[in-house]
Amino acid sequence: MSLEQKINNLETDLHIMGTLVLDSLVGAVRALEDKDTLKASEVMDKDDEIDDAYMKIDQDWFELMATEQPVASDLRLSTSILQASLHLERLGDLSVYLGKTTPVSYTHLRA
């Protein structure tokens, strides 16, 4: 597989991960708004899938660095993909935290 194909695969994996995180965040916000504990549970269950996507990108990136030794724009692009995946993984974790707060009653708070 060529360097270009490996970088394209990283981009595709990042896109898939971004879609998972977006679905998770939207689900967490909706669960919180609707006080839907079932939806919150579904969001928390998706976290492992997001973590797996991050680990795949991380492993593929290190393999790319070791075998292809990209330079210039290829190096910048592949490193940006790795950093973006880290931030997406963190957003996935934050959606889990939102999901965990869904069952909490906020009746003691007043507007």
Residue ranges and their predicted role:
Residues 28, 85-105:
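A structural feature that tracks compact, well-ordered secondary-structure segments
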Residues 25-35, 61-68, 102-106:
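Secondary-structure edge/capping motif, primarily at the C-terminal ends of alpha-helices
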Residues 60-87:
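Hydrophobic/aromatic-rich structural module bridging two neighboring secondary-structure elements via a short loop
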Residues 10-17, 39, 43-46, 53, ...:
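Amphipathic alpha-helix face/heptad-repeat signature
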Residues 1-48, 57:
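Leu/Val/Ala/Ile-rich N-terminal alpha-helices, chiefly Sec-type signal peptides and the beginnings
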Residues 34-38, 70, 90:
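Alpha-helical structural elements of signaling/regulatory helical domains
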Residues 52-60:
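Amphipathic alpha-helical coiled-coil segments
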Residues 107-111:
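Conserved small/polar residues in nucleotide/adenosyl-binding loops
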